[in-house]
Amino acid sequence: MKNPRQLIAFFLLLVGCAFEKKMNQKNEYYSEKFRPQFHFTPERNWMNDPNGMVFLDGEYHLFYQHYPDGNVWGPMHWGHAVSTDLVTWKHLPIALYPDRLGMIFSGSAAIDVNNTSGFGSPEKPAMVALFTQHLMEGEKAGKHDFQTQGVAFSLDRGRTWKMYDSNPVIKNPGKHDFRDPKVFWHEPTKQWKMILAVKDHVELYGSPDLKNWNYLSSFGADMGAHGGVWECPDLFEMNVTGSEQKKWVMLVSINPGAPNGGSGTQYFIGHFDGQQFRPENKDNLWIDYGKDNYAGVTWSNVNDGRRLFLGWMSNWQYATVVPTTVWRSAMTVSRELKLEETGVGLRVTSFPVKELKELRNDSTTTSNFLKNESNSSEEIKLEGKAHEIELTILKSKNEATFEIQFTNDKQEFIGIGVDSLNRLYIDRTKSGGEFSKDFAGKHYGKLNSTSDTLKLRLLLDASSIEVFADDGAVMTELFFPTEQFNKMLVKSNKGVSIPELKIYTLNSIWQKEDN
């Protein structure tokens, strides 16, 4: 028998090595090249659509499409994280695993406060998840009914889950794309409603108990964009800012068919009577004109009246080949949606949640940053990966143009500007995109105003830019330069001035996780 002291010393050495390895992993996992510093990312491996977004007992729950065994798409699980402020996140164990009915595709969650399902009690309501189950064997066999809708519930704030014994709650009637249920309570009819994506349209269902569902109506086969399959719908009521009017808004993601190619999210404004949705808008409207905001939906059960949104910050054209290593994909920042009358009509507008300002650290303010002179150019050095920039642009003539470039010593850059046609754009032709022919390009969006004054708020992270205009327009795009951007360059022709520019460095949301 070996000396007991030697055995104890050997055991302590093993424990110490394991602890050091774990700490090194934690110290490194948020600091790899391209790892976002204030956007949610999985600790490891693949992530796509946000799912099951619901608020309960002070926590915002984010479930998400996740493959825990690789950094490309694979058998889908529901990953899980929670936040108390929509900014910093705590990773939790995987919530839902594939079972005999298939992989766990996208869906939603609701709090059954009236215990209509019988899963909980009025004192302890269940968190109920509804999701698509995708049976790969059925798809490979050439069948059309391989996607069904299932239910699971939790009685401990989403920490553990039980599958409903009588799944599926909606069987497939023979439709190839039949997925992504979003569920909400409709008080006027005292029923749960479900909006479901079905190839090139959505279908609406009703239920008294989240378990027994009846078909109500369909929408969209002859409306909206139809360049690809409809996915990840959402339906909710909103107040029109500054009035007593209320409208219903429907979000529908589409892939491909977005304005700048690949994936994107369109929306419709109209009325919903509990049975049918009737749109008012005739034009195709988009939540975000950038290339990298897809499958976004909103949180349920939020207690402060805000309509809060989160999207997957990628595009199916290249999501599986972007040059990240340990993990793949990030979410957008959490956003507040508003319904507002603009210079071009009633629009859904987007703004970063107010809580994001808590990340602000050092700041610099420059007055009269750019004067109304011919072919002006100004440069500022940047330190760190995460920044927020606020600036006001004054245009003294219609054809005035400007461009803000974030660049490095290798002349790589991503550019943000407004052209002579008053189009907002992001230019990432030289931002590092050799991994995909669909990545590089100059991509255009629409502003909701023709005013001579434009306020911009730019959120720059290690590999993404989110551009918010004061009229609520937004563009989101990724970039992957060989070296970190370390300078900001502003160029303009005559007719543009910038009376004030503010730059904030932002703290990393993973610093607390490291501790």
Language model features with spans:
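Bacterial Sec-dependent N-terminal signal peptides
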Residues: 1-25
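Alpha-helical transmembrane segments and their juxtamembrane interfaces
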Residues: 12-16, 138, 480
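Beta-rich carbohydrate-recognition and catalytic domains
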Residues: 20-181, 185-231, 239-289, 304, ...
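Beta-rich accessory regions
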Residues: 242, 271-283, 287-515
